[in-house]
Amino acid sequence: NIKLNFDGIYLIMFITFEGIEGSGKSTQVKLLKAALEKIHFDVESTREPGWGRVGSLIRKIILDYDDIEIEPITELSLFCADRAQHVQEFIKPKLSQGKIVLCDRFYDSTIAYQGYGRGLDPEMVKKLGFGAALGIIPTVTFLIDISVNTALSRIIERPGRNRIDDESFEFHSRVRKSYLSLHNKQPNRICLIDGEKDIDSVQSEIRRTLRNRFSIFKRLDKLG
């Protein structure tokens, strides 16, 4: 498998996926991982929250325990604790080995959900979120954008809804608005993808963006 090693120095290729609930991020991570492995890249995929034993416990507290009330600041702290553990134990080591890492959510989610969705001070959220990332910055972020109406219609159809899935229309609207604002402020890193399209079209747009921006991904052309 191909590792990103040039003259003994490993390049960082950390690709994150963002979007409101029901945007199809997880599906796109799986499809891109399979495509990159098909052309012999060494790829790892992961998610937040929920990597590893600590992350799994934190995910269960945050998402599944609908019978307990979690204060927004507590929720933020749990997400940041999950990220610090995740970065230190998984993301940093994999990147240092020259592997491509695909991550379903990273610190942009914290800004959107806890900063704007929950109404916490955005500057405080940014500082804590970035601090928990331990200096790791995504190489590129794919923001898969869908309307809140589309999101809610997809959420209703899927099994195992969680506490955040069941938030109000207004909550999801604030989160989406925050994501679009982040894209407008950082268009070079955060690539806006139309998630209203079918799954294959979304994946094609993601691959096209990677081919156009990074020469190492030119071989994605072979996959169509």
Q: What are the language-model segments listed below?
A:
Residues 41-133, 205:
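ATP-dependent small-molecule kinase phosphotransfer cores
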Residues 105, 109-177:
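A glycine- and Lys/Arg-enriched "phosphate-lid" helix/loop adjacent to the NTP-binding pocket
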